[in-house]
From Swiss-Prot:
PANTHER family: HETEROGENEOUS NUCLEAR RIBONUCLEOPROTEIN-RELATED. It is found in: Nucleus, Nucleoplasm. Identified in the spliceosome C complex. Interacts with AGO1, AGO2, TBP and TXNL4/DIM1. Keywords: Acetylation, Isopeptide bond, mRNA processing, mRNA splicing, Nucleus, Phosphoprotein, Repeat, Ribonucleoprotein, RNA-binding, Spliceosome, Ubl conjugation. InterPro entries: ESRP, Nucleotide-bd_a/b_plait_sf, RBD_domain_sf, RRM_dom, Znf_CHHC. One of its GO terms (molecular function) is RNA binding. The gene is HNRNPF. This is Heterogeneous nuclear ribonucleoprotein F. It comes from Bos taurus (Bovine). There is a cross-link at residues 87, 167, 185, 200, 224 (Glycyl lysine isopeptide (Lys-Gly) (interchain with G-Cter in SUMO2)). It comes from the Eukaryota. GO terms for cellular component: nucleoplasm; ribonucleoprotein complex; spliceosomal complex.
Length: 414
């Protein structure tokens, strides 16, 4: 375990492997033998660019003895996840917190959360009931609609304080009716982004799980025009269908997507190519470090995929949905660094339930535009040595072409 440098920079530890719905209280209970500096204010979660908890947090402690006690908790469990504990320092903590998450410094504490997966016809009253006991500001609920006036299955909620917003994150994966609701950290800036000019509809091609190259069915995807680089026959973006069974919106073609492009930000920075058959379409990832999965069980969920890669913590997961509304048995999993993506390849051919999963690396050492440099990752206890060295030279076209160019492609249908 790599320790941070000694010095007079406070008493800080970093936790990694936290459950996605982890709350401040969960961290306090995990470190119950330690005294946390300033109580709840001493726990700092690290968020991804989409406002989701990254599975990591910094905790400020009162003394060096508290740090030693915290380090003894390394590899102990919180729920079904085992937690790694690293020694850190204030400089590292401040740098990471400044460079992670969707929020700028002036909007980081404005009390917003984003909901995803709302039932069709969900009302503001139901959202208020969902957050019963947490004060929402007047007119603090925003329900975005698409250009046709249909609800998107998402909502923004502003609470009376950032502390209440943090508590609201504890409602992640609880139900409204029969739907599981996902709760993410958000900001006023993100709410404003939903009032951008309407996104354009663009027709692209995507091969079905059993189609041969060149015979892909046509379907409609929604993309941000600024993110398009090239388009030819046979192209598609893997970012179009990442909402699995919880999304509250269907586009009429059988797959679900965010009409305001939030998860399509997956396609808008950190370029890498996806190639299918004779065509190609340049799409982009937020980090540029992706692993493509093939052979997923029909009922596999995002949480199953996160658990599959544990103790690694993917930045996000996109389960692919075909134009017939069924999962394709494939997914794209994005990691914060090239090193983590390479480490994830050690799970190639491992089982998920009764299916073995094929993995394809889609990452290069120079592609990262994320917050963590190699040097910083070393300081945070992450090895920068490749653990799956033979895969780094795989070309994107090679690993993706294999998914559709052969006769042994594994779909997700059992």
């Amino acid at each position: 375990m790599m320790l941070g440098p000694e010095g007079g920079e406070g008493f800080v530890v970093k936790l990694r492997g936290l459950p996605w719905s982890c709350s401040v209280e969960d961290v306090q209970n995990f470190l119950s033998d330690c005294t946390i500096h300033d109580g709840v204010a001493g726990v700092h979660f690290i968020y991804t660019r989409e406002g989701r908890q990254s599975g990591e947090a910094f905790v400020e402690l009162e003394s060096e003895d508290d740090v030693k006690l915290a380090l003894k908790k390394d590899r102990e469990s919180m729920g079904h996840r085992y937690i790694e504990v690293f020694k850190s320092h204030r400089t590292e903590m401040d740098w990471v917190l400044k460079h992670s998450g969707p929020n700028s410094a002036d909007t980081a504490n404005d009390g917003f959360v984003r909901l995803r997966g709302l039932p069709f016809g969900c009302t503001k009253e139901e959202i208020i009931q969902f957050f019963s006991g947490l004060e929402i500001v007047p007119n603090g609920i925003t329900l975005p609609v698409d250009p046709e006036g249909k609800i998107t299955g998402e909502a923004f909620v502003q609470f009376a304080s950032q502390e209440l917003a943090e508590k609201a994150l504890g409602k992640h994966k609880e139900r409204i009716g029969h739907r599981y609701i996902e709760v993410f950290k958000s900001s006023q800036e993100e709410v404003r982004s939903y009032s951008d000019p309407p996104l354009k509809f663009m027709s692209v091609q995507r091969p079905g799980p059993y189609d041969r190259p060149g015979t892909a069915r046509r379907y409609i995807g929604i993309v941000k025009q600024a993110g398009l680089e090239r388009m030819r026959s046979g192209a598609y973006s893997a970012g179009y269908g990442g909402y699995e069974e919880y999304s509250g919106l269907s586009d009429g073609y059988g797959f679900t997507t965010d009409l305001f492009g939030r998860d399509l930000s997956y396609c808008l920075s950190g370029m890498y190519d996806h190639r299918y058959g004779d065509g190609e379409f340049t799409v982009q990832s937020t980090t540029g470090h992706c692993v493509h999965m093939r052979g997923l069980p029909y009922k596999a969920t995002e949480n199953d995929i996160y658990n599959f890669f544990s103790p690694l913590n993917p930045v996000r997961v996109h389960i692919e949905i075909g134009p017939d509304g069924r999962v394709t048995g494939e997914a794209d999993v994005e990691f914060a660094t090239h090193e983590e993506a390479v480490a994830a390849m050690s799970k190639d051919r491992a089982n998920m339930q009764h299916r073995y999963i094929e993995l394809f690396l889609n990452s290069t050492t120079g592609a990262s535009n994320g917050a963590y440099s190699s040097q910083m990752m070393q300081g945070m206890g992450v090895s920068t040595q490749s653990t799956y060295s033979g895969l780094e030279s795989q070309s994107v076209s090679g690993c993706y072409g294999a998914g559709y160019g052969g006769q042994n492609s594994m779909g997700g249908y059992d």
